[in-house]
A protein has these predicted regions:
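A hydrophobic, multi-pass inner-membrane permease signature
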Residues: 1-202
Length: 202
């Protein structure tokens, strides 16, 4: 969805392209606030469902801007003109040319999105009630908060019990970041290329 939106906004023949881009940027500068967001999710019937964690993060305006900049800088207009002469339409050009040439930025967006969702617990905190739907990070937060309260309430500072609590805390944190450590090496080369998009000229 992000790449499709970025491709549409990169086309000069799109009517109202500047106004649409400004509308997208406006939502990034000024958010509606937490209460309207909560009411919207509730009225859409996504409260206490996993969709409340998935749908709000489907499109990120910053990612759209990054992808649009990448498309404008890596895919020249002459390439589309040559493809259109051969009878290639917008959607086919997107699938055959834009997607293959955008692999580095796609890898970066996937990594940013994965890290953002993996580290997020706030949406689950306000939208999810059932324990079987709660993500790992919410359990980790609840454990860390409860263990800190227990530490402060203990009058007798038992060194051994405090050491065990710290060990459990660190183990949970390590387990929570382990999937990202496993995932990152496979897309590291694309990540470096994507981050350097637009940084080197000449």
């Amino acid at each position: 969805v992000t790449l499709l939106t970025a491709f549409a906004l990169s086309r000069h023949e799109l009517i109202g392209r500047s106004a649409i881009s400004l509308f997208f940027a406006f939502t990034m500068w000024f958010s509606g606030g937490l209460i309207p967001f909560y009411l919207l999710v509730r009225d859409l019937g996504m409260y206490n469902t996993r969709w409340a964690l998935i749908v709000p993060g489907v499109v990120n305006v910053w990612n759209v801007i990054v992808c649009r900049t990448n498309i404008n800088s890596t895919i020249p207009e002459e390439m589309y003109e040559a493809a259109s002469i051969d009878g290639c339409g917008y959607f086919r050009f997107f699938l055959r040319m834009v997607v293959p040439l955008s692999k580095p930025i796609i890898a970066v967006i996937v990594l940013w999105t994965a890290i953002g969702h993996w580290n997020s617990y706030f949406n689950a905190l306000i939208f999810i009630l059932d324990n079987d739907k709660k993500p790992l990070q919410l359990y980790l937060r609840e454990y860390l908060v409860s263990s800190n309260v227990v530490d402060l309430s203990n009058v007798d500072f038992d060194t051994e019990s405090l050491g065990i609590q710290e060990l459990v805390k660190n183990s949970l944190i390590l387990l929570s970041v382990l999937p990202l450590w496993i995932f990152y090496p496979f897309i590291q080369k694309y990540f470096v290329k994507g981050v350097m998009v637009g940084a080197v000229k000449g």
